C-alpha cells in the first residue's frame, strides 16, 4: 500500500512539473570540469545498466541515483586539478611579464634611442652627409634577420635564441659606446638591429606559446602598451650605455624566471651537448636565409640610395635593386621546392623551410602582411618626418620638435586600450579592430597631409594622435589573427608579421626621402642653400642665415616637399584599406561550439579558436557565417613544465 501511494504521488508530481524547469536546471547547473568527464561517462553507463536491470524487476529505484566514486568532486566543490591549473597559469603569466618586459622595452627603445643624438654623433665623426646610415644600418638588419630568428626559435628553443639576441645587443651597444671610427659605429648599430630582430620576434612567439588565444590576448595587451612606452621614452633616455645596462639585467631575469618555462627546440634541447649545434644547424634553411637577407637588404639599400645619394638611373642604384629583386623572387621559389615531397626537400631532407610556402595557401597570410606593411609605413613616417616638418617649416629647435612626437603616443595608447576591449570583451574578434584601425590610420595620415599644407599645428598634433590610435588598434589583433589562422606554425607566422611591419616602415622612409629630396632640392639651390639633406638636421641652420624673403621661400618649399612625401605613402594605406575587406575572422573567445562541448564536459574554456578563412564580409553576405567556421583545437604543449597550458 505504501509503495503504491508513493508511486501515485510521483506520477502526479511529474505531471504538474513545468517542462521549462529541466531546461532551466540544465542551463544553470554547474558544468562538469574536463577532468571529471571520464567519471561522468562511467557513471552514466553504470546507471543505464542498473536502471535496465532494476526496471525489469519492477524496482522503484530512482533513475538518477548513482553513487559518486571516491575522490570525484561533487557539484558544489572545486576540482583540485582545475585549481592547480589556474594557479599555474597565473604564475606563468607573471613570470612572462617579469622576464620579457625588459627585453621588449629594449627592442622598442633602440629604434628611437639615438634620435635626439644624431647631430652630435655625426659631428663627432665629421660625417654629416652620411647621417642617415645611423638609422639605415639598424633598420636594414632589424628587418632582414627577423625570419631567421623565428627558425632559430623553433630549432634551438625560445630561451637560447632570446639569450643570443640579448648577447648581440650587449656587443652592439658596447661597440657603439666605444666607437672610434664611423665604421665601428655603424657595425654596432647593425648588430643592435640584428638583436632587435630577434628580441621582437622571439618575445611575440613566446607570448603565443602554451596558451589559448584568450590568454594570449591579455598578455599581448600589456606588451603592446610597454612597446609604446619604449618608442616614446627612447629619445629622452638616448645612449648606448642605457641599452647595455638593460640587456645585462634582462639576461639575468630571463635565466632566473624562464629557464624552465620556455619551449625547447626541436633539435637542440635542454641538456644537449655543444656537439649538437651542428646537427641542429643542418635543419636550418641556410640557402633560403641567404636569399632572403640579400634580397631584402639590397632592395632597402637601393631605395635608400635612389634619389638621395645617387640618381635612380645610376648603376649604384639599379644593380642592387635588380639583384635584390631577383634574390627575393628566388627565395619564394626555393621555399616552394623545399615543401615536403618536392625536389629540394629530397636533396636536403633535414632542412625545414624558414617561411613555408604552404603558409600562403591561406589568403589571410597575404592580406595580413599587407596590413602590417601599412602599419609600419604609418608609424615610421610619423616618427621621422613630423620632426623634420617642425624643424624645417616651423623653425622649432630640435628638442621642441621632438616633444611634438609625444602627441602620437597617447593616441597609440588609446588605440591599444580599444583593441584590448574589442579582443577580450566584445565582440572578441579580430576582424573589427583590424579594419577599424586601418580606416582610422588612413584618415589620420590623410588629414596630416592637409594639416601640413595649411600649417595648422593644432590639427597636426590632433591627427598624429588619431593616426597613433589606428596604429595601436592593429598591433595586437594582427598577431592574434595570425596565430588563429596558423596555430600549428606559430614561429614562421609571427616571423612574417614581424618582418612586414618594419619592412613597410623602412621602404616608406626611403620613398619619402627620395620624394622630399627631389621636391626640395630645386628650391634650396635657388635660395642659395646649395641643397639640404633630409636627415641632416644640422644643415637646417643655413636657413636662418638667409634673407627673410629667401627663408620664407625655402620653408614653404620644405612644407610642400614634406606634404608630397606623405602623399607618396598614401597609396600604401589605400591598398591596406582594400585588402582589409578580404580578411577572414578569428573568434578569440568562441562561444557556440565550445559552450556545447563544455556542457558535455569535453574541453576547457579557451581551448579552441574559431576561424573563417574566406572573407568575413562575404560570409556575412551569404547569411550563414557558422557554415564557414573552422575550429582550431589548441594542442597541449608536451614540453611544458606547467600544467594547463596549450599551444595556440
Annotated model-derived regions:
Residues 157-166, 182-183, 199-202, 214, ...:
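C-terminal module of multi-pass small-molecule transporters
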Residues 121-122, 152-153, 176, 185, ...:
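Interfacial helix-cap and linker-helix signal at transmembrane-aqueous boundaries
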Residues 243-368:
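Hydrophobic transmembrane-helix bundles of small-molecule transporters
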Residues 1-92, 257-277, 347, 529-537, ...:
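Intrinsically disordered, low-complexity terminal tails of fungal membrane proteins
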Residues 272, 479-484, 492, 496-634, ...:
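Hydrophobic transmembrane architecture of multi-pass small-molecule transporters
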